[in-house]
């Protein structure tokens, strides 16, 4: 089972003050050579995921656009299937479906949605994935789980990409990553979610990545093809002075040293050439071929594109 895949690069964002701004951003992402634009699913200060994805798909020709990620607790999986299949159908097969268990306690509290224990939220998401996959089949779905019940529902419409758009599931814990390794087309290695909500910002070391990838490979051992492996960049800086930049970024991540920062697969610092070499090495060592930028700094889109250009076709 080989991990080797060509590089793909993406950005995740959901901010725009107008239709024109959003359309121009999507077209800019495509023009700069990125493979994907992904849209988060959060309440505060963000565009709504489904219409933003459809707008970006409609504004571009080749760019793949996805959810990063649909929070399972915000919608029923039958609705999620219908929205995902419709997005794929209306884009001629350019949608990518990301789904997660939810982790940001604050937005649960703001909206009155119960923030259940991690085990319950993950179990509910696991059932949701089974419902979504079941609705992709031709026959009516009957499903009786602990969290969802479906009686004779036929999934419609059917997506262009069969049986479903590529499914992304990311996480930082063993249970979620093992499930992703068995069920997803794309597995994302992320900082682990804390039981009280939020993310463990120190959980981005090279040692953490090795441990998580061990869980993924063990769970995916019976699959004929290894899922595509994704890593999210939490920090990025184009600079000629890696050491100075690493010292500054270490102060932003509790418990990390400058060396930890330079070695972390979730952080990219240096010249464009140094970054390209780091990404080649990380693909060789870890298998990471799909890299997504998530910093929120406008200039980073153009700066990271320099790295994307160096690795085009590799």
Predicted features and spans:
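Active-site-adjacent structural elements that line small-molecule/cofactor binding pockets in enzymes
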Residues: 1-314
């Amino acid at each position: 089972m080989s991990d080797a895949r060509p590089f793909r690069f993406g950005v995740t964002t959901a901010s725009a003050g107008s239709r024109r701004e959003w359309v121009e951003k999507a077209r800019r992402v495509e023009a700069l050579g990125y493979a994907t634009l992904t849209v988060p699913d959060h309440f505060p200060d963000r565009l709504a995921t489904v219409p933003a994805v459809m707008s970006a798909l409609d504004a571009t020709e080749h760019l793949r656009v996805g959810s990063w990620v649909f929070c399972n607790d915000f919608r029923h999986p039958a609705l999620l299937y219908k929205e995902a299949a419709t997005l794929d159908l209306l884009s001629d097969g350019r949608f990518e479906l990301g789904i997660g268990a939810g982790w940001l306690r604050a937005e649960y509290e703001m909206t009155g949605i119960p923030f259940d224990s991690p085990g319950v939220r993950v179990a509910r998401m696991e059932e949701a994935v089974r419902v979504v996959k079941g609705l992709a089949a031709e026959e009516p779905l009957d499903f009786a789980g602990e969290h969802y019940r479906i009686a004779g529902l036929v999934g419609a419409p059917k997506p262009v990409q069969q049986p479903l758009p590529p499914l992304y599931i990311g996480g930082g814990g063993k249970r979620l990553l093992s499930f992703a390794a068995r069920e997803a087309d794309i597995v994302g290695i992320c900082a682990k979610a804390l039981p009280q909500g939020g993310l463990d910002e120190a959980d981005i070391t090279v040692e953490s990545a090795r441990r998580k990838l061990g869980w993924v490979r063990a769970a995916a051992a019976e699959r004929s093809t290894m899922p595509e492996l994704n890593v999210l960049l939490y920090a990025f800086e184009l600079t000629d002075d890696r050491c100075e930049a690493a010292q500054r970024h270490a102060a932003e991540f509790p418990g990390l040293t400058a060396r930890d920062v330079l070695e972390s697969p979730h952080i990219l610092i240096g010249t464009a050439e140094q970054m390209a070499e780091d990404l080649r090495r990380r693909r060789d060592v870890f298998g990471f071929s799909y890299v997504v930028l998530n910093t929120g700094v406008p200039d980073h889109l153009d700066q990271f594109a320099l790295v994307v250009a160096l690795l085009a076709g590799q």
